[in-house]
Amino acid sequence: MKLTMYMGRAGTGKSYACYERIREIITTCPGEPIILLVPDPATYRTERELAAFMPEGGFTTVRVVGFGRLAHQVFQSLGKAREDSLSDIGQKLVLRLLLKRHADKLEVLRRAASQPHFADVLQGLLAECKAFRVTAEDLRSGADKVDSMGLAGKLRELAYIKEQYETMTDNLWGSDEDSMEELIRCIGDSPLLQQAHVIVDGFHWFTPLQNILIQRMFALAKESILTVTLPAETEPERYARPGQLFYRPYEVYATYKERYGKQLLVRRFTKQHRFQSPVLEALEKGYFAYPSQGNQSKDTVAVVRAYNREREVDAICRRISSLVREEGYRWRDITIMLRESETYGDILEKGLAQYGIPFFTDRRHPMRSHPLAELLTGLLEIVQSRFNHDAVFRLLKTDFFPLSREEVDLLENYCLEFGIRELMWLKPEWTYRRRDTGPEGSDSYERETLRVSRIQNIHSRIVPLWQLLWDFGRQSHTGYEWCEHLYTCLESLHVPRTLSQWSREAVAEGLQEEADSHEQMYKRVIRFFDEVMLLAKTELLAPDEIAVLLREGLDEVTYSLGPPGLDHVAVTTVERGYTTESAIVFV
């Protein structure tokens, strides 16, 4: 089977040639399936570009997919779509349970295993092992070859954890690599790949597991095309030294050159089409060149320095407004590219909103401060802290309780005034009142009586839940029982109904992002409960252990949104920055 490789620098027309080939296939071979595999963050942009490229403004026989979407569609075509795959939170839960169960067998990693978020590190390590096809036996073999006893011990314990993890998740799909292995096994049975035209575009490098999948797809395909970002004006072997700028694309070339030999047809692209500015074209060609060359054009790249991030963002927003208002650009012509979203994300979003600039950011927003997250962690915290004042009122101010904010403030002032703390919350009645209220029957006495009566009414609405939490939350229970209890608490507080109401109110006010956050948060919490009940159904968990699991699980919960329209400023990061056709880019 032949493989056509499109080779060229960035902007030389490789993707455009892929679109042209797709249009040609649709014209000459209507009905034949086409698979366009691109990086997951690029699927939305690629679909839009390809639809705009087609004469009819759309397509029906082309599937634009990333690895994740490809797996889902193949499994769906075979009736293998499964709901019991583990989320990232579920995978970390498995690892934390394993570390708890087998703590006595860990000597080198025992101290690290007790640290917060160690499961995150372990999950990433196991995912890397899977992607690079490193088995537990490989880890043990490596342990036998190293001189350091500490390193050897770590490798052996990692091998043991890896085996236990794979055993525990044998009937579940965990990481993306797990689904990819299953995809490799069954992709040949799917009708989606039978006699399909397969085009792979936008990647700089592949893991060994991805390489196996792509080669399997090419073997099933009627036609195969792969793009590689390598300078076509020189021989690829020039970049064969590790550490060079184009070394990883060269590895892709070398891998497929070795596999296909004379069946590999290389089409070279040398003419630059993307960069309209001479300085950008020179920058792309010479930035990593040696010896370095100066700018020979009259154009320059503006480098702006600001006093702090807020002023930097303000300058960007003013410049964007000027470009649109005075120079005829549209919002969609502009992209802001960040090194990482955490540093600038909130500041930038606030600045763009203040200037009335429509924007879309592809970052995932953390949900740890969502009222539902505060509620769940607070339900456990008040028991652990024996009804600490701050914990109690942080919980009451989530607005899920049948109390108004005025009533919460009234209750808080009363508790501060009379020193109500800890187990005093569980008393069925509070009779504390001010002494200097005058004789019985006086106006001041009646006002105080009315105030105490109101406080008692407020207290009576929450003390049953406090008592339920206290009676249940002091002892160890199975993961199933903990989740059942927490869900019962959510139901008793009418949390689903409240979130639905908040979501409708947000939509009515035009706050679609806030509305979506309520819906996604509730779904993720229910998913978390499902996974705990599945994985720790009979596992006894102490109150502090379930609290750690819940806290770490909620820390991982994020939400993302789709673009609200087509005309907006795109805010992305270097790693996810596939919006390469913008006329104006702020880095």
What do these predicted regions represent?
Residues 1-49, 192-195, 199, 204-389, ...:
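Conserved motor-region signature of P-loop NTPase helicases/translocases
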Residues 2-6, 14, 101-202, 236-240, ...:
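Accessory N-terminal region flanking or inserted into the helicase ATPase core
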Residues 5-10, 166-215, 304-316, 320-323, ...:
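PLD-like (HKD) phosphodiesterase/transphosphatidyltransferase domain
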Residues 31-141, 149, 153:
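Conserved P-loop NTPase-based nucleic-acid remodeling module centered on helicase motor cores
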Residues 55, 70, 102, 106, ...:
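ATPase/helicase motor core of nucleic-acid motors
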Residues 63-69, 197-206, 210, 225, ...:
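Conserved helicase core region in the C-terminal RecA-like lobe
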Residues 79-99, 287-292, 377-396:
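A polyampholytic, Gly/Pro-enriched intrinsically disordered region
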Residues 148, 152, 156, 164-165, ...:
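Accessory C-terminal helicase-associated subdomains
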